[in-house]
Amino acid sequence: YAIAGRPRF
């Protein structure tokens, strides 16, 4: 999922 402009799994 994407959070605060940083894509993370």
Swiss-Prot record:
Tissue: Limited to neuronal cell bodies, neuronal processes and sinus gland.
Any Gene Ontology CC annotation: extracellular region
Top-rank lineage group of the source organism: Eukaryota
Main location: secreted
Cell compartments where the protein resides: Secreted
A single GO BP: neuropeptide signaling pathway
Residue numbers carrying Phenylalanine amide: 9
Keywords assigned: Amidation, Neuropeptide, Secreted
Signal peptide: none
Function: May act as a neurotransmitter, neuromodulator or neurohormone.
Protein family (similarity comment): Belongs to the NPY family.
Protein name, UniProt field: Peptide tyrosine phenylalanine 3
Record organism: Penaeus monodon
